[in-house]
């Protein structure tokens, strides 16, 4: 894992610099297409295709661009060609994560994953978001994932910080206290 992070860092930094150096490039839009490319590159069939010595880089490029949901800007195409030409398709998910970290740092925000036992409606998510932003002291980009094992409550992961207010966590704390 550390090796992929080391490989991905220069690509993420170069992409960030290219996005900030060019006028009119929306960092949030760039984050969206980088995440989309990463999701495509994470597909095992695509990785197998990219690793096949009989398949050219241009063929891999055409497949990825063809699978992408939206038209990629020229910057994205140039970036993708560079990654493919250097044989780093497997590093795209890590490149996307590091690029997102750079963008978040520049905006003073962080990504937060809210694990909930039940779906959260927009109003509840807004309330949770406001509370979490006060708790963590920064603006958060929330994403919600369902985890029925929590029984109730939420578990929030922001970087390496975890806030667990789930029923499951409380039950485990009680169990530990009773068996101690």
Curated annotation (Swiss-Prot):
Role description: F(1)F(0) ATP synthase produces ATP from ADP in the presence of a proton or sodium gradient. F-type ATPases consist of two structural domains, F(1) containing the extramembraneous catalytic core and F(0) containing the membrane proton channel, linked together by a central stalk and a peripheral stalk. During catalysis, ATP synthesis in the catalytic domain of F(1) is coupled via a rotary mechanism of the central stalk subunits to proton translocation.
Name of the gene this protein is made from: atpH
Quaternary structure (record): F-type ATPases have 2 components, F(1) - the catalytic core - and F(0) - the membrane proton channel. F(1) has five subunits: alpha(3), beta(3), gamma(1), delta(1), epsilon(1). F(0) has three main subunits: a(1), b(2) and c(10-14). The alpha and beta chains form an alternating ring which encloses part of the gamma chain. F(1) is attached to F(0) by a central stalk formed by the gamma and epsilon chains, while a peripheral stalk is formed by the delta and b chains.
Protein source organism: Acidovorax ebreus (strain TPSY)
Family statement: Belongs to the ATPase delta chain family.
Subcellular location as annotated: Cell inner membrane
Superkingdom of origin organism: Bacteria
Membrane topology: Peripheral membrane protein
Any Pfam family the entry gives: OSCP
Secretion signal, residue range per the UniProt entry: none
Protein name per UniProt: ATP synthase subunit delta
């Amino acid at each position: 894992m550390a090796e992929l992070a080391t490989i991905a860092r220069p690509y993420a930094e170069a992409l960030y610099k290219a996005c900030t150096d060019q006028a009119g490039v929306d960092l949030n839009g760039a984050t969206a297409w980088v995440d989309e490319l990463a999701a495509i590159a994470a597909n095992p069939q695509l990785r197998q295709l990219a690793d096949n010595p009989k398949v050219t880089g241009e063929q891999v490029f055409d497949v990825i661009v063809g699978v992408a949901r939206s038209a990629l800007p020229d910057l994205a195409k140039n970036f993708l060609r560079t990654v493919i030409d250097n044989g780093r398709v497997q590093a795209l998910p890590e490149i996307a994560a590091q690029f997102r970290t750079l963008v978040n740092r520049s905006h003073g925000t962080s990504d937060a994953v809210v694990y909930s036992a039940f779906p959260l409606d927009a109003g509840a998510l807004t309330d949770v978001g406001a509370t979490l932003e006060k708790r963590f002291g920064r603006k958060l980009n929330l994403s919600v994932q369902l985890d029925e094992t929590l029984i109730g409550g939420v578990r929030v992961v922001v970087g390496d910080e975890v806030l667990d207010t789930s029923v499951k966590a409380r039950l485990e704390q009680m169990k530990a206290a009773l068996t101690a």
